[in-house]
């Protein structure tokens, strides 16, 4: 059955009128319907691109605006909470329409992303401006799936929703592609994040112009009815002439706050925790856990979102062909659960780039297989209660998913509290460690470094005067004896001829006159006698000192340093000697670098040790979310077996023909 499209825009003529009055009085032919669906998907992709663009440069934003990871996550959390109430406002589109909201939102967000947010120079300006954008996008991202539903009968609903769900994923994919191709491996400045926002905003303005010129929507009398196949078109247009819109829209939330709507919305929201974690933190996760550059982390996003897009569209086509949704949700949930467990176990290990790429691709395929049929089934469940309240049902879902994200992002910094040192300091610490390997050695030998710092003056002297230290070591006995017998040696040095003459005699044969002279030279009286006795008793030690007197004289200028060096424990000297090359290299590190490492290296090392386990815990929570989703599937409308679904479609077609016959008989 066919029908011609009458005046397409509610009887309005002229360019200006068409920019304001966008309602179609009759259901469009297939070509125009596909065009409007494609335009809605384009708007959705653009809105999500603008929403997610910060993820590609999140590490640069944190560093440039001096944000902690916790502050960043809390910002995202409250952004979603604010967007949740924007989503509730979007429920009014059941009464006032969708297209103008989408067009306004595209213009508003493009201006903010291109020109306002990039001018933020502190974290509070960035946050508040992001909140404003979040409210507008919360409204638009409920209006767009409502438009998708309006232009797609149930028989093609999964395919249409598959294309719509490509919106967030294609938005993520564009973020990753643009980021991996425009963000250098080593950005020249942390302010480079504004570059990505400028690109995104300019593209957004182009999409706004296209939508402003061409986007349309169905009139309320057309969209507020259930359409199973395109063959229902004539019946819908006939019924539209007598539909009571006010009655259909009375007490909308009371009509839809039911277990099948609410629990299903909660379930898919917790299933998508892993998706929103990837959107917000994939770059942070890959750079801090596996050490990838921002460029390579965005490259992994290409794999994740590219495969997700293919899965979303393919499963939509297959679900429509087989006429069932639930088996695909189960299959996708199981695949997602298994792959996510394998993926989370990689933390703390060293998987290759392509190992992670394949896991991300498979995980995204599983989520896509589950999500597209859920979107189709959810809108069909809402239609089963009241087809006039699609936007209200999607607003409830939009509110719930943003509240769930808000709560999860509040929880995330509690579970993962190790990211801030890695994001804020990890890059500099790693770069310094690569440039100065001795810093890495110092980190693994703290006691050696501490001892070297404690005795730095003594060890520095030893390193600068190795021959002096070697001589002092060689003549250590003589040096000790020189100090011990200093008075005796002073007397001998002052009276060399007298002691040379005395050396010709034994102590018992020295002439009395010579003995008297010796006693007088030694200080006279008992003092002189005692000193001579000491010389006589320690003749060998004193002779040893005299034998190397020239060598000891060369060491005399360093006596203070050698005395201080003698106070250093031998074990410290041994360790310093064994590690002299490393300590010498460490001494050449600029003081500013050493100070930075001293302030932050320990925190970075501790965080790096804790972070993999904390991320695993979070991903286990995400696994639980997918399992809860699997348990909720029976609540949704729809058959499990294709033959049962085909029978329902045949019965509906018979009803349509009967209704058309009645309308024809009464006209």
What do the PLM-derived regions correspond to, one by one?
Residues 129-167:
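Cytoplasmic helix-loop-helix junction between adjacent transmembrane helices
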Residues 54-58, 257-305, 309, 371, ...:
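Extracytoplasmic gate region of multi-pass secondary transporters
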């Amino acid at each position: 059955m066919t029908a011609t499209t009458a005046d397409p825009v509610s009887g309005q003529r002229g360019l200006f009128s068409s920019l304001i009055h966008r309602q179609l009085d009759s259901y469009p032919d297939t070509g125009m319907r596909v065009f409007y669906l494609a335009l809605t998907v384009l708007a959705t992709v653009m809105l999500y691109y603008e929403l997610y663009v910060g993820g590609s440069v999140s590490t640069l934003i944190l560093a440039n605006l001096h944000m902690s990871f916790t502050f960043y996550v809390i910002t995202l959390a409250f952004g979603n909470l604010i967007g949740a109430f924007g989503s509730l406002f979007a429920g009014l589109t059941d009464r006032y329409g969708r297209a103008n909201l989408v067009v306004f939102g595209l213009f508003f967000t493009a201006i903010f992303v291109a020109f306002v947010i990039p001018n933020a120079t502190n974290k509070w300006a960035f946050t508040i401006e992001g909140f404003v954008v979040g409210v507008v996008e919360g409204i638009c991202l409920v209006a767009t799936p409502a438009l998708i539903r309006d232009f797609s009968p149930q028989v093609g609903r999964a395919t249409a929703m598959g294309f719509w769900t490509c919106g967030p994923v294609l938005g993520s994919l564009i973020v990753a592609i643009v980021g991996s191709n425009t963000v250098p491996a080593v950005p020249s400045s942390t302010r480079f994040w504004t570059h990505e926002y400028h690109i995104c905003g300019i593209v957004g303005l182009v999409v706004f112009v296209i939508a402003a010129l061409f986007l349309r929507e169905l009139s309320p009398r057309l969209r507020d009815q259930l359409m199973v196949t395109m063959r229902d078109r004539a019946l819908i247009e006939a019924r539209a002439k007598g539909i009571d819109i006010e009655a259909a829209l009375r007490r909308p939330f009371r009509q839809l706050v039911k277990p099948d709507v609410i629990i299903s919305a909660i379930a898919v929201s917790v299933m998508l925790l892993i998706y929103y974690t990837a959107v917000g933190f994939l770059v942070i996760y890959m750079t801090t856990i596996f050490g990838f550059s921002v460029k390579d982390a965005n490259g992994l996003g290409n794999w994740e979102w590219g495969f997700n897009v293919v899965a979303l569209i393919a499963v939509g086509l297959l679900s429509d062909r087989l006429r069932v949704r639930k088996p695909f949700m189960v299959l996708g949930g199981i695949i997602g659960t298994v792959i996510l467990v394998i993926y989370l176990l990689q933390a703390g290990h060293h998987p290759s780039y392509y190992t992670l790429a394949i896991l991300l691709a498979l995980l995204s395929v599983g989520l896509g297989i589950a999500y597209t049929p859920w979107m189709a089934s959810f809108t069909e469940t809402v239609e089963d209660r009241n087809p006039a309240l699609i936007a209200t049902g999607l607003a409830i879902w939009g509110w719930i998913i943003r509240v769930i994200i808000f709560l999860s992002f509040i929880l995330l910094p509690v579970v993962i509290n190790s990211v801030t040192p890695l994001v804020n300091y990890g890059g500099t610490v790693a770069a310094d460690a690569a440039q100065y390997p001795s810093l890495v050695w110092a980190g693994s030998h703290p006691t050696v470094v501490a001892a070297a710092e404690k005795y730095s003056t003594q060890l520095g002297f030893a390193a600068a005067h190795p021959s002096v230290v070697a001589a002092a070591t060689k003549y250590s006995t003589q040096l000790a004896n020189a100090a011990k017998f200093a008075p005796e040696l002073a007397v001998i040095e002052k009276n060399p001829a007298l002691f040379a003459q005395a050396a010709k005699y034994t102590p018992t044969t020295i002439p009395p006159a010579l003995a008297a002279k010796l006693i007088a030279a030694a200080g006279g009286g008992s003092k002189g006698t005692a000193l001579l006795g000491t010389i006589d008793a320690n003749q060998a030690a004193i002779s040893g000192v005299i034998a190397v007197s020239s060598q000891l004289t060369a060491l005399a200028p360093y006596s203070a340093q050698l005395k201080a060096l003698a106070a250093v424990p031998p074990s410290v000297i041994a360790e310093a000697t064994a590690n002299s090359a490393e300590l010498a290299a460490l001494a050449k590190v600029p003081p500013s670098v050493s100070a930075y490492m001293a302030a932050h290296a320990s925190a970075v090392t501790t965080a790096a040790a804790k972070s993999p386990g904390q991320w695993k815990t979070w991903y286990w929570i995400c696994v639980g979310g997918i399992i809860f989703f699997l348990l909720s599937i029976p609540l949704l409308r729809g058959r499990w077996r294709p033959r049962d679904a085909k029978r329902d479609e045949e019965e509906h077609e018979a009803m349509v023909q009967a209704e058309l016959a009645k309308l024809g008989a009464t006209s």
